[in-house]
C-alpha cells in the first residue's frame, strides 16, 4: 500500500482533492437562492479552496492516514487471527473453541456442529474457520477426545461433516488447560459474553502441538515436539541442567537436525519418508514427512519414474 501511494505524483493528489474553485465567502451572501439549482453555480460554490502551489502538509497527512490504517489492520490480523500466543500456545480461534467446549462440558460427547455454533458467540469469522480449526486440533489427539470419522493426516482424507462427528475435552485438557481463578478475561466481540485473554496452561502447548500462521508482514511456524521429550526437558530445566530437544512428528520419518539452529530463524530440517521394497512391483510406505500425505508422496514417486 505504501508503494502504491508513493507512485502517485504529488501534483496529481493536489489536483484530485483541490481542483475546484470557490468564491470569497463575502460574495456568497448576495447570491440569488434561485441559482442554487444551477449546476454551474454549484460548481462555483464548492467547499474546496484553490491551491496554487504544492501543499506538502496535505500529502503528508494522507500518507500518515494510510500508514495508520495499515498498522491497525496488520495488528488485528496478527493478534486476533493468525499468530498463536506464546503463553498458552493457542490462536484465538483455538482458545475460543476450548473455552466453548469447557462451558458445554458435561462429560458426554457433543456434535461438532453444536460446538461450532457455540463458538460463534466468541469468534466472528464464520463457521468454516471454526470447523477447520476444531478438526485440526482433534487430529492432534491431545486436547480433544474425538468420535467418528475425523479424517486421516497420513492420507489427507477429510473429516466427515460436522453434524456426523462428535468431540469433548480430553482429561488432559481438563486437568492442564483451565483454571478460572487464574484466568484474565475480556469481553467478546459483541460485548455479550466474557472470554479468556489467555488460558493458564500448565504444559507447553505451543511446542507440543506446533503452530503455523501467516499474518500481515510476518509468519510463524513452530514444529510439534514429542510429549515425553517435553516432560523430560521441563525436568532438566527446573533442575538447571542442560538439555537438547528437537521436533518430532506424528507421521514419523527420518529427520536431519544438523541445521536446526535451536529452532531459531534460518534453521532448517530435512525429513525423509520410510519406504520398504516388498517385491519388484510393490513399495511399502510406513512413514512420511510431516505435512505431506501419501497421495502427494505417490505422485512425486510417479513423476520421478517418468
State where each predicted segment sits.
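Catalytic phosphate-handling regions of large nucleic-acid enzymes and associated NTPases
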Residues: 13-266
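Ala/Thr-enriched low-complexity intrinsically disordered regions
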Residues: 2-4, 41
